[in-house]
Swiss-Prot record:
Listed GO MF terms: lysophosphatidic acid receptor activity
Predominant cellular place of this UniProt entry's protein: other
An example Gene Ontology biological process: neurogenesis
Tissue expression remark: Expressed at high levels in oocytes and at lower levels in brain and spinal cord. Below detection level in lung, heart, kidney, liver, muscle, stomach, and intestine.
Protein name, as recorded: Lysophosphatidic acid receptor 1-B
Function in brief: Receptor for lysophosphatidic acid (LPA). Plays a role in the reorganization of the actin cytoskeleton, cell migration, differentiation and proliferation, and thereby contributes to the responses to tissue damage and infectious agents. Activates downstream signaling cascades via the G(i)/G(o), G(12)/G(13), and G(q) families of heteromeric G proteins. Signaling inhibits adenylyl cyclase activity and decreases cellular cAMP levels. Signaling triggers an increase of cytoplasmic Ca(2+) levels.
Ranges in the topological domain labelled Extracellular: 1-52, 110-123, 187-206, 283-296
Gene that produces this protein: lpar1-b
Family in the record: Belongs to the G-protein coupled receptor 1 family.
SMART domains recorded: 7TM_GPCR_Srsx
Residues where a 1-acyl-sn-glycero-3-phosphate binds: K41, R126, Q127, G128, L129, I130, D131, W212
Amino acid sequence: MTSLSEFVSEPIGMMSQTSAASESQCYYNETIAFFYNRSGKYLDTEWNAVSKLVMGLGITVCIFIMLANLLVMVAIYVNRRFHFPIYYLMANLAAADFFAGLAYFYLMFNTGPNTRRLTVSTWLLRQGLIDTSLTASVANLLAIAIERHITVFRMQLHTRMSNRRVVVVIVVIWTVAIVMGAIPSVGWNCICDLEHCSNMAPLYSDSYLIFWTIFNLVTFVVMVVLYAHIFVYVRQRTMRMSRHSSGPRRNRDTMMSLLKTVVIVLGAFIVCWTPGLVLLLLDVCCPQCNILAYEKFFLLLAEFNSAMNPIIYSYRDKEMSATFKQILCCQRTENVNGPTEGSDRSASSLNHTILAGVHSNDHSVV
């Protein structure tokens, strides 16, 4: 005969098993609307004025990103004066930003009301493309900062890094970017853990967003430290040079030119990335904050960084600017065909600015 305690404990055990099963349940077959509704993120049913504005502006920026970065890659390929490690990294940066343009272009046609048509797999693919492209861009910026740091402190115009090492660096950059973009698709998501879903990215886990945000912030801090170290080093050199030479104006111009470049690089990164990174942290740490109202605009702001990189790193170079004009005008001159006398003087303006102060200081002291 079944006792009363056994009779009561049996349904309790069944309830606990049901609860455990529900906690481990996965929702791969659910619609995107299911995740959006659960996270509280509004999913548009029709195109409104804001959605049309964001889409139109986004497509325009995407086209500019792809054309501008394609121009950079072609310029570096056709001009032999750019066949140095720093320019190969700049070409890879342009490739990463070109890929970012493609990723955003795909996003623009799969956002707004079109999001409802996506499956779980295609939604993760859409976000993964963006994560991969942005990670590649940031990693390239870091690689360029490291290369500049090594070049300045070794007092060289170009690093002696072999082409094989440059290829290894590029492969590492893209490997890291692809892994970072693929992590949510291979399991680090909230499809089986709905309680920890993000509000901004309803299929992403809060823990992954924190990890991705910290990864980018640490990269940003490393870049700041590297450029700050370069600036302090060059400033000390130029101050010594001003005491041992008769060209203080040149010294001051050298230091100010470097400062301007550093401010542009870091300023663009801060303006374009910081709001989005802060928004991701607020999404996890401040659930009551109304962050979704600013999401699309901060996404566009981050997208602008890929459009600004060709201008910052390439267009300030006079040789690069001249090559742009020759390509756009379908001209072919000896400057593009191969190196000529004075080609070293046409190198990167940042290289020339830094090394002008460093080498002049060495000669004046000696």
